[in-house]
């Protein structure tokens, strides 16, 4: 079911369907008010211009079935719309990176260098780009996130029910995600699992940094060796928990940082690979296994390495 919409004067009223129940008010508004800056959305909620069942609510309010949401008609100047529209030529190719799609979800092979959502100095991300490229889509939400510089598999829900079902699978840890990473040196075969708690810190510059700390959250990653090279190893990393920068910090903790990691990497190792042509973090979300949220079918999807990373591996093989 979809939201029922009524427009009266300069106000819109939306009746929340069962499919949309459970989501936060701010996320609902972001989907309905496409192109409206997030700061403006929070402002109209704070000022009470947005109401639920005639009452004021906070942005994190969880919408219920049959709630009536009052939203003022918001007019955005072309200036405010520019960040997404000026980037559309760059992100239009995202359609070519869709690995799987049906009526409730899609799976994307996200290119490196594109954030999954706007923010942190980025005016757009994958989800904003998909919404702009598909204005007819009633619902598009990220199921999970991967870092901007990481490429590979990203799940996007096209229905609220699919989002809820996939989130439940993530909470129950029944989703299996495998990454490929090129790391410094010869990875030791006996290092097949790292359990090291991770703590997030924010530097004065505002940059987020993660470190291993007893005060951190429990974190676990499993590892296996895919291919060895003279001074590097291609490994498979399977995160059991989903902490920020988990694979990047766990490989650093093991003494084998990922190639071209500008936060946790090794400059000398990176310099050699840059001479070979590597210009991005060598971390790729390679495969995912999960239960289809609608049919319960077991899904296994792989995302191939891009041409750039394949070329780097070919050069390393030639050095053997």
Curated annotation (Swiss-Prot):
GO terms for molecular function: 23S rRNA pseudouridine(955/2504/2580) synthase activity; RNA binding. Keywords: Isomerase, RNA-binding, rRNA processing. Coiled coil: none annotated. It catalyses: uridine(955/2504/2580) in 23S rRNA = pseudouridine(955/2504/2580) in 23S rRNA. The keyword rRNA processing applies. InterPro entries: PsdUridine_synth_cat_dom_sf, PsdUridine_synth_RluA-like_CS, PsdUridine_synth_RluC/D, PsdUridine_synth_RsuA/RluA, RluA_PseudoU_synthase, S4_RNA-bd, S4_RNA-bd_sf. The keyword RNA-binding applies. Its EC number is 5.4.99.24. SUPFAM superfamilies: Alpha-L RNA-binding motif, Pseudouridine synthase. One of its GO terms (biological process) is enzyme-directed rRNA pseudouridine synthesis. It is an enzyme of class 5 (isomerase). The active site is at residue 147. PROSITE patterns: PSI_RLU, S4. Residues 23-95 form the S4 RNA-binding domain. Responsible for synthesis of pseudouridine from uracil at positions 955, 2504 and 2580 in 23S ribosomal RNA. PANTHER family: MITOCHONDRIAL RNA PSEUDOURIDINE SYNTHASE, RIBOSOMAL LARGE SUBUNIT PSEUDOURIDINE SYNTHASE C. Belongs to the pseudouridine synthase RluA family. This is Ribosomal large subunit pseudouridine synthase C. It comes from Haemophilus ducreyi (strain 35000HP / ATCC 700724). The gene is rluC.
